[in-house]
Amino acid sequence: MKGYVESSLLYSTWSEVACIGDAVVGFLFGRIEKTWKGRSRMRTLLVELSMTARFLLRNPLMLARSFGLMWNVWITELKLAEHRPRSDAEIELLIVDSKNRGEGIGKDLVDRFITAAKEAGAEVVTLYSEDLQSNYQFYEKYGFRRVATFYDDVTSYFANKASTAIIYALDLKQSTDTERQ
């Protein structure tokens, strides 16, 4: 999980943490394209490859499985490139502690991100999720629409069972706050 969070943070230009008292109960990492200024995508990719190599070298069993993992990552990235619509912003990672779900924390985090994206001139927000652990009903209730699904090679690899990737998009020109109540 730590590596997944670090990777998501690498590609993010916006982050927010939700706390109740001293406890972190949720966070959202997102990318708003117009705020990417001065960041090198190649450098970001190299940092992510370095993180992945460190992870694989720590565990000999993972190193042996690394070729399978890399193949699955490559295939999934190709599918994402094929199916993901053009967007100005993307939710990289949204997590709310299971004990605090249903309290409006996720909605508040997404509302703040959407507001920042609109203020930056974004027109479309996308997100990539999967069917095994995602609360996809939350995204659909919020107003995101499914634009693509495909076999998720990476999640299936780690879960050791079939998983479907889901790509969502929210058109900010058509979306209003009253739709998401």
Regions found by a protein language model. Name each.
Residues 13-17, 27, 93, 165-167:
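Short hydrophobic/aromatic beta-strand element in the GNAT-like acyltransferase core
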Residues 35-88, 153-161:
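Conserved acyl-donor/pantetheine-binding loop and adjacent beta-alpha core of acyl/acetyltransferases
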Residues 1-15, 19-21, 29-32, 50, ...:
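Active-site rim helix/loop that mediates acceptor-substrate recognition in acyltransferases
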Residues 88-89, 117-130:
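Conserved GNAT acetyl-CoA-binding A-motif
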Residues 128, 145-162:
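Conserved catalytic-core motifs of GNAT/GCN5-like acyltransferases
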Residues 22-27, 89:
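Glycine-rich phosphate/pyrophosphate-binding loop shared by adenosine-nucleotide-utilizing enzymes
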Residues 96, 102-115, 141:
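Conserved acetyl-CoA-binding loop-helix of GNAT-fold acetyltransferases
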Residues 94-96, 129:
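Hydrophobic adenine-recognition pocket in adenosine-nucleotide-binding enzymes
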